[in-house]
Amino acid sequence: MAVLLSGQYSLPVSREVVYAALNDPDVLRECIPGCEELEVRSDGIFAAVVRLELGPLKTRFRGKVRLEDLDPPNSYRISGEGDGGIAGFAKGGAALKLVPDDEGGTLLSYEAEANINGKIAQLGQRLITSTSKKIADRFFESLTNRLQPNPRTAESQ
């Protein structure tokens, strides 16, 4: 089953800060919903374990993620695959673009596709797509909160 997602998010910091955060394993580990492990294996390649709940199905996916077509601080492509054991297998990728906005922040846009099989695919397109969108929204909400300028820091300077 193929799943397509796209979205835009406004972040309150520069592209350079957003790009650096999106390449920082500590930031990613903190912001990815259900992320239990995220380790750098080599330049641009991460190994991950993510706990996922899709409707009645709960599983852990173990997989690899690769950052490709790096164009700092403008864009990159992320691709990966994960094995959820009896729950199924997922493989996909996303293109991310970072554009400065008029207020000194960044407009992040993405287009993602994933191919899913196994028990997860049997849950249906609507549930998988809506859950995937919620996971993306939670990730970007966490990222925004993490990158939010701290008013106390600005006042104390």
Give the positions of each predicted feature.
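Glycine-rich portal/gate segments that line the openings of hydrophobic small-molecule binding cavities
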Residues: 39-82, 138
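A conserved amphipathic terminal alpha-helix motif
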Residues: 119-156
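Intrinsic-disorder/low-complexity, polar/charged segments enriched in Ser/Thr/Lys/Arg/Asp/Glu/Gln
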Residues: 2-8, 45-47, 60-62, 75, ...
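Beta-strand/loop substructures that line and gate deep hydrophobic ligand-binding cavities in soluble
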Residues: 82-131
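Glycine-rich, flexible loop/turn motifs
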Residues: 28, 34, 53, 57, ...
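Hydrophobic/aromatic beta-strand elements that line small-molecule binding cavities or substrate pockets
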Residues: 7-9, 35-36, 63-69, 92-100
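Solvent-exposed residues in well-ordered beta-strands and their adjoining turns
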Residues: 10-14, 51-55, 68-70, 81, ...
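Hydrophobic ligand-binding cavity/cleft-lining segments
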Residues: 1-45, 49-53, 103, 154-157
